[in-house]
Amino acid sequence: MKKLTLLILSVISISLISCSTDLQTNSCNGYQIREKNFNYPHKIRFKMQRNKKIIVFGDSISAPSDFSWINQFEKKTGCIVINKAVNATGYTFRPYNYTETTTKTILDSDLEDIDYVIVFGGINDIQFNRIPENIDVAFRRCCHKIRTKKVISIIPLIIPDQDNYSTNFDAKTALQIRQNFYKASDDYGFTIINAAMFDIERSDGLHPSVSGGKTLCNEIIRALQEK
């Protein structure tokens, strides 16, 4: 089985409230998943090798479009990207189809022949005020599946002043979800990228423009090569 070396986090959803001893959990609803008895390797460098297979999970930031960061990523790295991102999704919900969530997509995917995994997200679960504890359980289930792999978590900037996008959320929920992502990634030895740390031009106030996609691509590659 090939070793996966990367993942980028996304908030995509499905109501997962079941207990799991595999997750080191003491609580069915999630907030006590805090036992850190993992022993995973430190970060490893991303090698720019052509024909490496990368699978991408996430929401509309990565979903197929006329232009996305993925197009540039393939051109610059020579990697083969398998895109499994779904629009309007989150870890514990999807407004139109509850089976199409990032969590379920990750858990159902065969990663045996994949070299790297990238997961995006952060906006949808926050936007719809999903319960942080449930998102934490769902995300940790994803982490557990790829626990021997490397993860880079991208938490997109939340934009509270947009009329049509991220308006329906409160700061406390956003902070809890972000902290849970950081904590889970730290527990599993994954790397975090916070997209709010660099300026991404947006075509509609939320989704990256052509220029924004290039910036995102470059920042992802840069982050992968840092360690």
Q: What is each of the regions a protein language model found here?
A:
Residues 54, 81-83, 151, 189-194:
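Conserved beta-strand scaffold positions in the cores of enzyme catalytic domains, especially
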Residues 120-124, 145-174, 196-199:
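Active-site segments of SGNH/GDSL-like serine hydrolases
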Residues 84-86, 195-200:
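Short glycine-rich catalytic loops that host catalytic nucleophiles or stabilize transition states
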Residues 47, 51-56, 61-137, 172-175, ...:
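Conserved SGNH/GDSL esterase-like catalytic core that processes O-acyl groups on lipids
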